[in-house]
């Protein structure tokens, strides 16, 4: 289900902001219905009339976290501690780690945008609340109404490939703010941004709810299976 929702979100972004067939004032697809397009020298392509193109770092900023010593790690939730988000946590919940909550830590909620700095550099992450490690960077939208548009922009194939390849071409192979500084982002009118934000927020909520339900089933399986195997529990016909 979540793969389908993610694919729908990607298709909607492509339809509205790459093909420019967002609904016009009559509800018809803008470009296909003859909407006015103008050449943009920065992007080297036509964009809808009235849109502007600005440096990416005018709509968002980059934030990093420090790396606490491993001696501070604990592996069960405890008061005064916060979850320590690592890249691997987006693939599995089997190595959950907690660290002391301090004022120096940057904390993210489940909707905030994170990005891999190493390995799969440029991959966009979200869905876990806590403090992120040094292998991740936070993308802070200056206007929260632009968060889903920014997330989709960064997740698009062209931008991901550009960031990943530009990072891999460097000697350290680490994504940082300088990679984002190269980007330019098209800015549609406010009404279109708000409409997109409303649709995508509903999708994100559904995705996170599905993740929670899936995790509950996994936890139940992990609790019940050992008891079934050693005979502590049985299933009645």
List the predicted regions and their residue ranges:
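Sequence-specific dsDNA recognition surfaces
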Residues: 36-43, 57-74, 80-112, 132-140
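Short coil/turn segments at secondary-structure boundaries
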Residues: 27-28, 69-77, 164-167
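Short amphipathic alpha-helical segments
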Residues: 43, 135-137, 179-183, 203
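Non-catalytic DNA-recognition/assembly elements of restriction-modification systems
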Residues: 1-18, 32-67, 190-236
């Amino acid at each position: 289900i979540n793969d389908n929702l993610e694919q729908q979100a990607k298709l909607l972004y492509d339809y509205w902001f790459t093909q420019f067939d967002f609904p016009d004032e009559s509800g018809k697809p803008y470009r296909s219905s003859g909407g006015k397009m103008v050449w943009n020298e920065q992007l080297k392509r036509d964009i809808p009339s009235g849109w502007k193109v600005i440096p990416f770092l005018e709509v968002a900023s980059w934030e990093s976290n420090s790396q606490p010593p491993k001696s501070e790690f604990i592996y069960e939730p405890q008061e005064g501690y916060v979850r320590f988000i690592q890249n691997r946590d987006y693939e599995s919940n089997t190595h959950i780690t907690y660290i002391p909550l301090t004022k120096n830590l940057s904390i993210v909620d489940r909707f905030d945008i994170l990005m891999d700095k190493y390995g799969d550099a440029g991959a966009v992450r979200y869905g876990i609340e806590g403090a992120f490690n040094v292998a991740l960077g936070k993308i802070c939208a200056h206007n929260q109404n632009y968060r889903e548009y920014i997330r989709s922009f960064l997740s698009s194939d062209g931008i991901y490939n550009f960031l990943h390849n530009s990072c891999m071409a460097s000697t350290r192979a680490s994504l940082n703010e300088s990679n984002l500084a190269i980007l330019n982002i098209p800015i549609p009118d406010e009404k279109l941004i708000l409409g997109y934000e409303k649709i995508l927020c509903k999708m994100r909520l559904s995705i996170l709810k599905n993740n929670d339900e899936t995790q509950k089933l996994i936890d139940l399986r992990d609790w019940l299976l050992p008891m079934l195997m050693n005979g502590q529990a049985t299933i009645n016909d």
